[in-house]
Design a protein with these regions (language model features):
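Hydrophobic ligand-binding cavity/cleft-lining segments
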Residues: 1-79
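Structured surface interface patches that mediate subunit assembly and partner/cofactor docking
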Residues: 2-11, 45-55, 95-97, 111-116, ...
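Short, hydrophobic/aromatic-enriched beta-strand segments in well-ordered soluble domains
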Residues: 33, 91-93, 139-143
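A conserved amphipathic terminal alpha-helix motif
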Residues: 153-188
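Beta-strand/loop substructures that line and gate deep hydrophobic ligand-binding cavities in soluble
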Residues: 108-164
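Intrinsic-disorder/low-complexity, polar/charged segments enriched in Ser/Thr/Lys/Arg/Asp/Glu/Gln
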Residues: 12-20, 86, 121-123, 134-138
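Glycine-rich, low-complexity intrinsically disordered segments
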Residues: 35, 39-42, 86-93, 104-106, ...
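Hydrophobic-ligand binding "helix-grip"
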Residues: 72-133
Length: 190
């Protein structure tokens, strides 16, 4: 059983990407935990584009100061970390809304217990496995919509963002790979 199955065994949407890394699983997973997508110009640009409607509405309503900072990994809750194996983040919300409709989860227990009609749950995992002297790094995103209404609302959003999401995932994996391999080079040089 994969760690993500503990948190989101049922889902209607899924996206999986992977890459090989010349570093030990523990180093790769640590690089994944340390990575911040907000440091990627493409990610920031796509999030800015995604948030244009929210920010425009706030400006029109004279509430520019009430708009949250740009979306990022800080919105996610770390659900579990198994060193050298996997880590899972969770996010809950109405992602199709201009403001993402996020519901703050304080803990893994809150995430597991949450079940509200009209509100989706997302799980994002990074898994590492050693394969022939390399580490296979895989990221999987799953989304569960608890009812027909949320499923119908989320579906067009998923198909709209999925191509960009795939590019972002590939860039994240590449950055984690580079950071992991650089850590090995730096460690070997000292």
């Amino acid at each position: 059983m994969h760690l993500i199955d503990k948190y989101l065994p049922e889902y209607g949407f899924s996206e999986i990407h992977g890459c090989d890394v010349n570093a030990a699983p523990e180093i790769v997973l640590q690089a994944a935990m340390s990575y911040r997508p907000e440091t990627d110009m493409f990610f920031r640009s796509m999030i800015a584009l995604r948030e244009v409607p929210m920010r425009a509405l706030a400006r029109l309503r004279g509430r520019e100061n009430s708009v949250a900072p740009p979306f990022g990994l800080h919105e996610f809750t770390l659900l579990e970390h198994r060193p050298g194996e996997a880590l899972v983040y969770g996010l809950v919300g109405q992602f199709w809304k201009t403001d993402f409709g996020l519901v703050k989860m304080e803990s893994a227990e809150d995430y597991l217990a949450f079940c509200t009609p009209g509100v989706a749950k997302l799980a994002l995992t990074f898994t590492v496995t050693e394969q022939g002297g390399k580490t296979r790094l895989v990221t999987e995103t799953r989304v569960f919509c608890p009812d027909r209404k949320s499923h119908l609302r989320f579906t067009p959003y998923w198909y709209l963002i999925r191509p960009v999401s795939g590019i972002i995932r590939s860039r994240i994996l590449n950055s984690i790979r580079k950071a992991s391999e650089t850590a090995i080079s730096s460690f070997g040089a000292s």
